[in-house]
Amino acid sequence: MDSTISVQPGEAPDSLHRARRAAWGSFAGAVVDWYDFLLYGITAALVFNREFFPQIGPAMGTLAAFATFGVGFLFRPLGRIIFGHFGDRLGRKRMLMMTVWMMGIATACIGLLPSFNQIGWWAPVLLVFLRAVQGFAVGGEWGGAALLSVENAPQGKKAFYSSGVQVGYGVGLLLSTGLVSLISSLTSDQQFLSWGWRVPFLFSVVLVLIALWIRNGMAESQEFEAQQSQDNAPQMKKRLPVVEALLRHPGAFLLIIALRLCELLTMYIVTAFALNYSTQNLGLPRELFLNIGLLVGGLSCLTIPCFAWLADRFGRRRIYITGALIGTLSGFPFFMALESQSVFWILFFALMLANIAHDMVVCVQQPMFTELFGASYRYSGAGVGYQVASVVGGGFTPFIAAALVTFSGGSWHSVALYLTAGCLLSALTALLMKKHPVD
């Protein structure tokens, strides 16, 4: 696009040291934010219906718990607008330090929150408030972290260097699932419900301090600094960054929403909804999907950078479409495996969805989305599109899936169709969208 400012092949790339510091800083913050955000989803599936909604029955309590999970996504676009605006004006690094602080404090407070039996309806009210703060913080995280790594990355290696943001997702999933699984194995059911689930939330403080130390060494990208020099000239004053992005590239927001469906549905159905469905509807042990979450998180630390390297070599679009089609073909077999209660096939199709399909589409998102917008409003544009997609396609995925099962008499077919259709739409969107030179 003619309005997009990017490093051209003939220009000198950012130093390798600068690129690596940006990649590590983006990775560290992403670990904290995704650890906190995913920990909530895991705990909502296991605990929150009984701790915060015991008065409305198991089925409705599950729906209420998953609804609070979705609340975080509702506030992500607002966080993206606020952090994106100031990130485009004041710099990415300042905003990224703030998102980590905010997420860590909110998560630790959830770990200290009294239950419904202790303070009544104030418990779920405060839970929703803290979840909203989490959503607001993570809303500001992705765009800034992705931009800092993409803008600092050497030309031709942007997918690989920016993949740390998504690897942070995998490490966050690994840590959150692993710690919940460890505490679950060391405590009785009553102890886990009483205090055990709180330990992983309080552990977030340690991760926050580590991430802040790493991020403090990051520098702004040369591309952003160059753009700021242009924008400081009187003749270059512009509208608010988010308004600029909306006016210049309205179609880009719809593209991002459609492209993220595969990623969001595959991950949240496998890691959040299936955990609840398999334990409450099928009687499978909760350790099964907690261990699957561990495996998914661990493998993604390898698969995401590998797929990103392949995308830089063979084209982003090819990798993305392949992943989305794998997700399309794995939806119904995954639920058939659940019904059969075969551990081998459950594991196989869970990995096909949450590792292969999911990781192939997320590994190219940072450069694919950010290059839809100009550098002066990229934080706002790519970030708002990303977070609106989170609301539309991801935030209420466990809630929608649970509602489909509840109102269809316990049948899984509608959820499998929901998953399959979303992945197929993502594949078709990638196939038909305007081709980028590196795709």
PLM region descriptions:
Residues F160-S184, G385-T397:
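Glycine-rich segments within core transmembrane alpha-helices of 12-TM secondary carriers
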Residues R318-V364:
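C-terminal transmembrane helical hairpin of 12-TM major facilitator-type secondary transporters
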Residues W101-I119, I326-Q341:
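C-terminal ends and interior cores of transmembrane alpha-helices
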Residues S185-L202, A403-A421:
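A membrane-interface helix-boundary motif in multi-pass transporters
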Residues G41, P250-L299, G394-P398:
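Extracytoplasmic gate region of multi-pass secondary transporters
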Residues R89-V100, R313-A324:
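Cytoplasmic membrane-interface "Motif A"-like loop-to-helix N-cap segments
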Residues A44-R76:
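Extracellular/periplasmic helix-loop-helix junction of adjacent transmembrane segments
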Residues A211-M218, M368, T420-D439:
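Multi-pass alpha-helical transporter architecture, strongest
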